[in-house]
Amino acid sequence: MLRARGPGPGALLLRAALGLGRRGRSWQRPQGQDTGVQVHNSLTGRKEPLIVARSDAVSWYSCGPTVYDHAHLGHACSYVRFDIIRRILTRVFGCNVVMAMSITDVDDKIIKRANEMNVTPASLASLFEEEFKQDMAALKVLPPTVYLRVTENIPQIIAFIEGIIAHGHAYSTATGSVYFDLHARGDKYGKLVNTVPSATAEPGDSDKRHSSDFALWKAAKPQEVFWASPWGDGRPGWHIECSTMASEVFGSHLDIHTGGIDLAFPHHENEIAQSEVFHQCQQWGNYFLHSGHLHVKGTEEKMSKSLKNYITIKDFLKTFSPDVFRLFCLRTNYRSAIEYSDSTLVEAKHLLLGLASFVEDARAYVKGQLTCGPVEEDVLWERLTSTKKAVKAALANDFDTPRAVNTILDLVHHANRQLRAVSKEASGPRSPTVFGAIISYVEQFFETVGISLANRQCVSGDSSTVTLRCVVDELVRFRLKVRQYALDTPGAAGEARKRQLQERQPLLEACDTLRQDLVTHGINVKDRGSAASTWELLDPRTRHQKPGDRG
């Protein structure tokens, strides 16, 4: 469930009880290089110019997974959306992104699951960390510059906690735990959601000073993994991990921090509090970007393990391709909730197939394999120019991918209308250059956001793939010659031509059978009239959804 952005009555009463006034947004516009992009900054609740310290080293911290179970589509949605943004920043706006991502490999959920499975927490975390990375690779999510595991940063976390204590914002207890003193933070707490944690009933043995204080270090419990610390054996709290690891890489200032909307409070809010106290700075992170939840269609429930309404990434990819999922994500703004259903995925799949079909047909036209009537070349050049301008403007406006994709689809629609196949040789000039330019731009756009429309024959350059391509080329050429012979009856007319075609009908049937057989092996042959035939490799998840042949 999405959290409200304003404080409720209970929160206001708690702030009054703590001596905290109503917080105003006090965001400081950074100094540095303007990327040319406007982003919705959760720190201000509005769009701001994205200004980074250095465009050749944009610092970006991403909250990564807690590796205790299989990753599901709710996770995938957030990571794919931010991967798209990262690609746009890099490839459209020329930023070099340095991304650090956390791996929480010790926490309550990991310990509980390890006990249930009768394995060590370390082995469980290692198993699901590797699976997470495989899932991200399968979804074509670019890996971060560096992964940061909690268990490899325990000394740094302890030192970070000591710094917060030294600045008077944390305290240790007799039981060996350490808590952040929210009262000491005063009116500076609540930069993201303008609230503080609601008062909650504490166990009778709680040694917190205030119920809203949160753990920096948790005293060890029997049979739990622990590390030695100045306060006794224990392990880190959740929020302190990210503050420490982000600071280890980026120091006291961070350009971009990302995560799902459910992390805004309390996780990111607590990160801000810890980091600004430790570094003694007014603004640790300049921009916080949050992605909307993936919802199950017909409900307001987010997809989550706790609600048992999730689909694992591996199961999803048995039915749909990563490109289909990526297009599904592109069609909504990254901040919006997105509704999951088979129908929306099928719609994305058909859009992708239509785009690939257009590219294939346009390429056939450029190569002279598709005969068309006259083309309104000037109109297409003008539309291509306006499309490029509109797409860049959309991406600069808080990464408005729905608008960008719709603009591309409009270009494809108008270009497709010009590819009117004719059965006879068309008279007049051809316009291959403009279609070549459109192909190049459309493929480049989708490649930028991580989707490949290029002929799948060319995705691998190893020798066996090249050999296979040559073999299929020869097979398709041989089939074309047989088909042309079966259809060509020079000098014959009337009954003689009819008899000749009937005699050669088995050859045409054999050509059709071969084409159908090749589809079962993932190869789609298109006959473009009697003059040419082309082929492409099919995604096994979509090979039965291929649009019909043209020509």
Curated annotation (Swiss-Prot):
Motif 'KIIK' region: where in chain: 109-112
EC number: 6.1.1.16
Pfam families for the chain: tRNA-synt_1e (PF01406)
Disruption phenotype: Mutant mice are embryonic lethal.
Motif residue range(s): 'HIGH' region: 65-75
Broad class of enzyme this protein falls into: ligase
Cofactor note: Binds 1 zinc ion per subunit.
Ligand binding (L-cysteine): G64, T104, H267
Entry's Gene Ontology BP terms: cysteinyl-tRNA aminoacylation
Residue numbers covered by motif 'KMSKS' region: 302-306
Cofactor(s) of this protein: Zn(2+)
Database matches in InterPro entries: Cys-tRNA-ligase, Cys-tRNA/MSH_ligase, Rossmann-like_a/b/a_fold, tRNA-synt_1_cat_dom, tRNAsynth_Ia_anticodon-bd
Function: Mitochondrial cysteine-specific aminoacyl-tRNA synthetase that catalyzes the ATP-dependent ligation of cysteine to tRNA(Cys). In addition to its role as an aminoacyl-tRNA synthetase, has also cysteine persulfide synthase activity. Produces reactive persulfide species such as cysteine persulfide (CysSSH) from substrate cysteine and mediate direct incorporation of CysSSH into proteins during translations, resulting in protein persulfides and polysulfides. CysSSHs behave as potent antioxidants and cellular protectants.
UniProt note: domains: 'KIIK' region and 'KMSKS' region are required for cysteine persulfide synthase activity.
Protein name per the record: Probable cysteine--tRNA ligase, mitochondrial
Organism: Mus musculus (Mouse)
Species lineage: Eukaryota, Metazoa, Chordata, Craniata, Vertebrata
Primary gene name: Cars2
